[in-house]
UniProtKB/Swiss-Prot annotation:
Induction: Expression is induced during host plant infection. Belongs to the RxLR effector family. The lineage of its organism: Eukaryota, Sar, Stramenopiles, Oomycota, Peronosporales. Effector that is involved in host plant infection. Contributes to virulence during the early infection stage, by inhibiting plant defense responses induced by both PAMP-triggered immunity (PTI) and effector-triggered immunity (ETI). This is RxLR effector protein CRE12. Keywords: Secreted, Signal, Virulence. The gene is CRE12.
Length: 165
């Protein structure tokens, strides 16, 4: 299929620039010198060969100029940018609310009364290791010196409680 199309195009390029489209042009070439094969080869050499300037098949259409002409593309881009900034603002708001809630919850652990009457005894009942307590606070988004101090105090509390035998 491709070969037939290529041959048809090659014949068209050989005949059309010549300007002699007639039955005589399609017939065997007439030459006074040489044989039939030589005349045919001379005629094929006369066909201009295209200059190869790289891989022509991989060229793509550039739509950048069309985007400048079509109305509404810049408005669409602006709307998309606005939506993205609104999403980012909502995420920041949610993160701030979550941080405020965690900070409010963590305030109770600053009180010795809460630690020794509620938190430490419940952790002992659950048989939580100090590392698990640290992981618990980390899962809720708290870490640092305050958490380290609570974990150390819990470890001391756990070691000073008499164990039941």
């Amino acid at each position: 299929m491709r070969l037939a199309a290529f041959v048809l195009v090659a014949v068209a390029f050989a005949i059309i620039p010549d300007g002699r489209v007639s039955a005589a042009a399609l017939g065997p070439p007439e030459s006074s010198e040489g044989t039939h094969e030589k005349a045919r080869l001379l005629r094929l050499n006369a066909v201009p060969q295209p200059v190869e300037t790289g891989n022509q098949e991989e060229r793509t259409i550039n739509f950048a100029s069309i985007k400048k002409i079509v109305p509404g593309t810049s408005a669409f881009k602006n709307a998309q940018a606005l939506k993205a900034s609104q999403k980012a603002a909502l995420k920041a708001q949610d993160a701030a609310k979550r941080k405020a809630a965690v900070d409010k919850w963590f305030k109770q652990f600053e009180s010795d009364e809460f630690l020794f009457t509620a938190a430490f005894p419940s952790w002992v009942r659950k048989k939580m290791h100090p590392d698990k307590v640290r992981e618990y606070f980390a899962s809720l988004g708290k870490s640092g010196d305050d958490v380290s101090m609570i974990v150390k105090r819990y470890d001391n509390y756990r070691q000073t409680i008499p164990t039941k035998k």
